[in-house]
């Protein structure tokens, strides 16, 4: 199960961003080549494990840039529309600015197209430090949006624990990946995420 994902992670080159070990992978970076079979395998497993249902989820909320392709395939499979938390300000009515800090960057994100009566599933490629998800989840809570589920493809580092401690939300992921001795290691996560 998830053979394509695991293989792509194990074959990922590792680079340093400051003190942060960063693996370069189609899921997290769009390079090397992102194969449609990999995206489909991921979306199929999200649907199988977490069962996003249009009766209980109004929108999928993904985070630019690497959450977009996962949300797109998931939207096609579930018929649930998605919105993108962007890195660019549009100035639309109701736009909410969010400050995010990760292990290797800092900046603003902008939420549009989400209202207080929405029920959403948040999806992203990876939770690592938890900084991006913390910022987005706290903003959604302030907007009085009902967060039904938080899903990432990959759990790396302590981010899921940090998100749980600070927001109460459980981040459910497909696999756990880490960098050990300059190589990516991959562990299965049981079906519950």
Curated annotation (Swiss-Prot):
Source organism = Methanothermobacter marburgensis (strain ATCC BAA-927 / DSM 2133 / JCM 14651 / NBRC 100331 / OCM 82 / Marburg) (Methanobacterium thermoautotrophicum)
Q: Which top-level enzyme class is recorded in the Swiss-Prot or TrEMBL entry?
A: transferase
Q: Where in the cell is it found?
A: Cytoplasm
Q: Name one GO molecular function term.
A: guanine phosphoribosyltransferase activity
The pH profile of the activity is:
Optimum pH is 7.6-8.2.
Q: Which Gene3D superfamilies match?
A: 3.40.50.2020
| Protein name (database record) | Hypoxanthine/guanine phosphoribosyltransferase
Q: What is its main location?
A: cytoplasm
